[in-house]
């Protein structure tokens, strides 16, 4: 009996790539090998695709093998990085990063490589309808929601509006636009938008996963509110007083946290009009700016969020279900 070739797409460029990587490994391990042939299809930071050699599947995180150690710049503080932290790479430079990790393929080759796509990709390019549209173009069946439902599910603002119009019970919601927030000279004034929502409330990015950039506000603490909105927009602000109060080791740990896509804003990021790619570079720039007596430095992730959604806190028990549609329907 010919085994069904299951392409497990995992990794990707989103903030949730580590969750995706771990999920892909779980699927790879648990597929019934008597019926299926699992093919690990790793999507790198730039959207390139390769059949990943099996030994890399069992690394603790993506940063443990990609980018490969020979491409890593020297770091006196032991910073771990993702491939995009190497700078603005040409396509050929991107290819060189993956040459020793597996077999590089094009998405157009997938119909000849797999029979079914098991999608473990998270966030942008994974759950927003893009990969789904491409797979449908190549007539490859895949797991999960279709194009439209994926796109709607990814944008929480549109999702809430459609649910409300369809008669579903939804919590009270207010939305803050990034451009309006950045242009305002009085961000404290935005807290008046929370009157209809009440407290406690949840502040989260409109186009990210359910665990990314989220804060819970218990009361109308203005400073906590501003911090929560900045967090959801992936903006970090630090004052000279805060910076100078830290030891050098504490500054290093702060840089590591801010540079981490899972708990910080991630890099590359912008300070004024300068693009910062590497944590070591960020450390040096902050030392320079605060040495020049800058009062507050704002660091904004290049992978920006356009909207922040604030909604009433829901109490209850979460649940999920899987709906399987028969081929005939």
What function would you assign to each model-found segment?
Residues 116, 201, 323:
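Short, Asp-centered acidic motifs that coordinate Mg2+ and/or phosphate
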Residues 122-123, 207, 327:
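Short, flexible active-site-adjacent loop segments at beta-strand->alpha-helix junctions, enriched
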Residues 323-329:
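Active-site loop ensemble at the mouth of alpha/beta enzyme cores that anchors a bound cofactor
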Residues 135, 311-313, 321-323:
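Conserved metal-phosphate-binding beta-hairpin within the catalytic cores
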Residues 2-9, 14, 22, 107, ...:
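Active-site nucleotide/adenylate-binding loops and adjacent lid/helix of ATP-dependent enzymes
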Residues 51-53, 213-214, 322-323:
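Short, well-ordered secondary-structure micro-motifs
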Residues 318:
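C-terminal active-site-proximal or functional interface alpha/beta core segments in diverse enzymes
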